[in-house]
């Protein structure tokens, strides 16, 4: 019996659906919190994509294989549960994979080209993105593009310049005016297509993320802020993985209660709704 909107969890690069190691902690904490607060196992879903070998992280891209598989998984959950909508909680590379599988359309991947189909927006209630690289990653500028995950087509390339600023992606403030850098084709397309991910979209990240670095800045804007976001939460002290592992209660608040968590002590620097563009 389904009484809650089912939740699908999508992990990031070299992580897993559930805890398997210190570096691949999965969604175990979040799933347990939801179970402790009235959800049943029939309402919570996660699947692993890729492997947990961190040395393979630089090889992963937004390819057809993973996007088609994850989209089929979302459709299977909708079909299996019979629910009119599902919600997605995503982390790291899972954010951009999740956004693309919902938006649908063409993918020009390193493993070939494919079409994901029509947008699934009408079937997604809440989309939560934790520590995503929506505008790319500054570590991918310049020579970083030599790594597949940083490529200019379907990777995390942030662009090498913006205005007169060159190879200074993570500086804040930027020395010169910056307006509209050219970056990863897939990311640029997603950020400008005006296709929403869900009825309600939330973004959350940490100012001291040890993977994204640079205070989450990419050419003067937070890369973890999904353009269509209704609200955002900015943490002060969490690592990249802790932004997922230590925020189960906040995830529940945003996805189930559909509101923002209250700022508490020093953990949250900002918890606010985002004005519509």
Where are these regions (language model features)?
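Helical cap/lid subdomain of alpha/beta-hydrolase-fold lipid enzymes
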Residues: 67-71, 102-277
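Alpha/beta-hydrolase active-site loop
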Residues: 58-80
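Loop/turn elements at helix/coil->beta-strand transitions in domains of secreted/extracellular proteins
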Residues: 2-7, 40-45, 81-86, 121-128, ...
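Active-site loop/turn elements of alpha/beta-hydrolase fold enzymes
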Residues: 46-51, 132
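Gly/Ala-rich beta-loop-alpha elbow adjacent to hydrolase catalytic centers
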Residues: 89-94, 98-99, 131
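Extracytoplasmic/secreted envelope proteins and their assembly/folding machinery
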Residues: 7, 27-31, 67-74, 99-102, ...
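Short, flexible/disordered intra-domain loops and linkers
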Residues: 17-25, 55-62, 145-146
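Short, surface-exposed "cap/lid" segments of acyl-processing enzymes
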Residues: 1-46
């Amino acid at each position: 019996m389904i009484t809650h909107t089912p939740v699908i969890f999508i992990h990031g690069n070299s992580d897993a659906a559930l805890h398997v190691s210190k570096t691949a902690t999965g969604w175990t904490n979040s799933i347990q919190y939801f179970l402790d607060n009235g959800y049943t196992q029939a309402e919570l879903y996660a699947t692993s994509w890729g492997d947990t070998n961190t040395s393979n992280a630089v090889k992963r891209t937004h390819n057809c294989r993973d996007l088609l598989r994850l989209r089929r998984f979302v459709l299977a959950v909708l079909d299996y549960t019979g629910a009119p909508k599902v919600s997605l909680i995503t982390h790291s590379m899972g954010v951009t994979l999740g956004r693309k599988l919902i938006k649908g359309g063409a993918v020009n991947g390193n493993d070939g080209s494919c079409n994901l189909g029509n947008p699934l927006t009408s079937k997604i209630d809440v989309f939560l993105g934790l520590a995503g690289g929506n505008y790319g990653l500054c570590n991918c500028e310049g020579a970083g593009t030599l790594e597949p995950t940083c490529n200019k087509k379907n990777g995390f390339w942030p662009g090498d310049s913006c205005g007169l600023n060159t190879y200074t992606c993570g500086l804040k403030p930027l020395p010169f005016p910056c307006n509209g850098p050219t970056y990863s084709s897939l990311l640029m397309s997603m950020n400008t297509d005006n296709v929403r991910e869900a009825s309600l979209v939330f973004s959350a990240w940490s100012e001291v993320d040890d993977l994204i670095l640079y205070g989450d800045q990419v050419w003067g804007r937070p890369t973890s802020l999904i353009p269509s976001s209704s609200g955002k939460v900015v943490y002060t002290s969490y690592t990249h993985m802790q932004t997922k592992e230590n925020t189960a209660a906040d995830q529940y608040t945003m996805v189930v209660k559909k509101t923002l968590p209250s700022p508490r002590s020093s953990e949250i620097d900002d918890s606010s709704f985002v004005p519509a563009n």
